[in-house]
């Protein structure tokens, strides 16, 4: 579970304030009371001069004990019972939208709450839902934002083609002043955890992760009715998708390597149903090809997220464009996919070369220093 370092556990961090008294000269020794003497006039008593401090930190009084002001750790989120995953997905989307709108950021930046749900669904550690929930819900704001950056970086490293399509979900993490959004990000994160985002996407079995389309429910709930009408974007009921998959796909006659195409697929609800249909016939969706397109960049980004969450395999192409006007959006996406994978390989190879060069320099330094250097 080394990868759990993506979100370091929050601990109680004491803020120490040492109450040191102000530096001052010690008061002069008081004159003792006059003692009568048989002599006509008593001799004057000398005044004891005040001693200078030995140094800046000399202090004639004892130092007060340190004051410990503990900062209490955040309380973890306790998820609700999700019940039917499809109903739970709708509840999560609606709750996230309500939380986001109540955080004073409004709907004009719906990419941020969608990005949060997507990142939690993509969390690379599967099968440790309780641990992951505790770590995320108790980490600091800085760790939370950094954790989201690392999730998307890891996604790009493993699937650069799909990671590039998720660009609309990543931009806010690199903006100036992103820390100012931490309060709203925290609230949406807690809401998504409470409503079971990890319960629905944190299993090691892709079949269990394919019961619902969280990205569609989240985007639909956040988008205004007018915007949905303008885009022609509506959430297709999963029961209808299931029926259409059964009616249109003869799983018994399918050959491995066959491709499925969806020119206006939204976040991929039909592909989710089709993948489950294949699994019901003991077929692995990763043995087939999947090409999906949508006009809306945010929906296409959601489809890229779902392709990983649902385990559709390595042969996935997600494009964004007007399929009726352009016609070749899938072919173009296939070419872009090959270029992105090549670019990733070059970058990783360059980083490996730099690391190897650094290790070689260290080894040469040790050799030249001789056996006594250790």
Task: Give names to the regions the model predicted.
Residues 104-108, 180, 202-210, 232-236, ...:
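Conserved aromatic-histidine-acidic binding/catalytic patches
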Residues 236-336:
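Conserved S-adenosyl-L-methionine
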Residues 311, 316-373:
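Long, ordered, amphipathic alpha-helical scaffolds
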Residues 1, 373-374:
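Short intrinsically disordered terminal tails
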Residues 128-224:
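Long recognition/docking surfaces used for binding and targeting
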Residues 200-253, 273-276:
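A short mid-domain helix/strand-loop element embedded in enzyme catalytic domains
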Residues 2-26, 31, 39, 44-157:
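Charged, often flexible domain-edge or linker segments that flank or initiate folded functional domains
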